[in-house]
């Protein structure tokens, strides 16, 4: 995280080679993650076209989602987005900047208009855990068209990381309980990246 801003981008050819090698090993699902993967949306769509036997997924802040991208996503049919959101407008903008929540909602509306599958990604910390797992928030995300959800606990990384944002032991226990309730009662496929490790016999990343 301390290296954000440095230009360490993989070329399209390298990305394509990684996927080709992965397929030889039986891997057909690929995730793109931060900074902001959609700064490479042209290359991602190109990869989707070239590897129709694979499915691609990206975490995004939604600011680069436009109608053209939505049309391309619908055409390739093997690319989905999870929008980073941390609860209601107040708690989302608290850590991600003023106006971020509204931009995410606008991107969700655009995706729904184009009848695309999408979800949300929530980083839970000391000041938003109860908000981001509340019925009010989850139901709102479902109504906006989300079909899946990723939950990540805040981990302080980098030179100026805030340790005061770490979720408490009680909040992590609450998340374990609530994620199972959400899966049982909501039309939403929800995953807690940390607490659900038991289902993958270890790290969910693979």
Task: Give each language-model segment a name.
Residues 1-13:
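Canonical Radical SAM [4Fe-4S] cluster-binding loop centered on the CxxxCxxC motif
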Residues 2-5, 89-95, 157-163:
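A short acidic, helix-capping loop that chelates divalent metal ions and anchors anionic groups
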Residues 12-32, 40-153:
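Radical SAM/AdoMet-radical enzyme domain recognition
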Residues 154-206:
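A C-terminal junction/extension of Radical SAM enzymes
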């Amino acid at each position: 995280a301390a290296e954000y801003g440095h230009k360490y981008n993989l070329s399209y050819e390298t990305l394509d080679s990684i996927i080709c090698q992965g397929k030889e090993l039986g891997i057909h699902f690929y995730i793109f993650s931060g900074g902001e993967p959609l700064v490479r949306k042209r290359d991602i769509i190109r990869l989707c076209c070239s590897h129709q036997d694979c499915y691609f997924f990206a975490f995004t802040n939604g600011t680069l989602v436009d109608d053209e991208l939505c049309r391309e996503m619908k055409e390739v049919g093997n690319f989905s987005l999870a929008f980073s959101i941390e609860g209601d407008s107040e708690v989302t903008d608290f850590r991600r900047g003023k106006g971020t929540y509204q931009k995410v909602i606008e991107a969700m509306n655009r995706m729904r208009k184009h009848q695309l599958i999408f979800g949300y990604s929530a980083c839970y910390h000391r000041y938003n855990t109860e908000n981001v797992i509340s019925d009010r928030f989850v139901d709102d995300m479902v109504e906006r068209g989300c079909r899946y959800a990723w939950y990540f606990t805040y981990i302080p990384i980098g030179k100026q990381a805030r340790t005061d944002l770490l979720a408490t032991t009680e909040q992590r226990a609450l998340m374990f309980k609530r994620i199972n309730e959400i899966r049982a009662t909501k039309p939403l496929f929800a995953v807690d990246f940390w607490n659900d490790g038991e289902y993958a016999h270890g790290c969910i990343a693979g």
